[in-house]
């Protein structure tokens, strides 16, 4: 079991349904496990829940609700598996995601930060062990000129096991 911090976006119903429709076809690893989200703190197995909750509550006080716009898909080789991922990348709101991520990786999480993996704010919408399939998925998305507007007003601290995500605390920005 690991702890993870997720930003679950507020989306218009049509955008949520469109994302879920795409994920149902192309997100074989996570569609049935977790809702559309942005990962702010990646799996941490070594910190207890109360300590992480306190840290996130303290760090989140520096932030308010913010908006983002997704307009572009990009593929990225997973750092944790042999899969390639398809990400929707926020064109607007990008810097706030980065600052939020950086604020979380201070104090007790400072040594958990993977400096060998660049942080790219993203919403995962697809994955496959065949990188060329992922490239085709991303090309399909980018041809559509998507524009998905959403907001982030809270962070969820979750327990993550292989096929299970359970929210243990919601922290409002």
Name each region found by the language model.
Residues 1-173:
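Histidine-dependent nucleotide/RNA phosphoesterase domain, centered on the 2H-phosphoesterase fold
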């Amino acid at each position: 079991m690991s702890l993870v911090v997720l930003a679950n976006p507020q989306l218009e119903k049509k955008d949520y349904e469109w994302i879920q429709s795409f994920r149902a076809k192309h997100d074989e690893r996570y569609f049935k496990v977790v809702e559309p989200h942005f990962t702010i703190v990646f799996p941490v197995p070594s910190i207890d829940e109360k300590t992480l909750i306190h840290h996130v509550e303290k760090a989140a006080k520096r932030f308010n609700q913010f908006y983002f716009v997704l307009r572009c898909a990009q593929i990225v080789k997973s750092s944790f598996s042999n899969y390639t991922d398809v990400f929707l990348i926020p064109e607007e709101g990008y810097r706030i995601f980065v600052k939020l991520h950086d604020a979380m990786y201070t104090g007790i999480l400072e040594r958990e930060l993977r400096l060998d993996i660049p942080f790219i704010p993203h919403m995962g919408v697809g994955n496959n062990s065949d990188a060329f399939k992922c490239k085709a998925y991303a090309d399909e998305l980018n041809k559509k000129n998507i524009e998905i507007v959403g907001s982030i007003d809270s962070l969820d601290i979750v327990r993550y096991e292989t096929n299970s995500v359970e929210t243990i605390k919601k922290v409002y920005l």
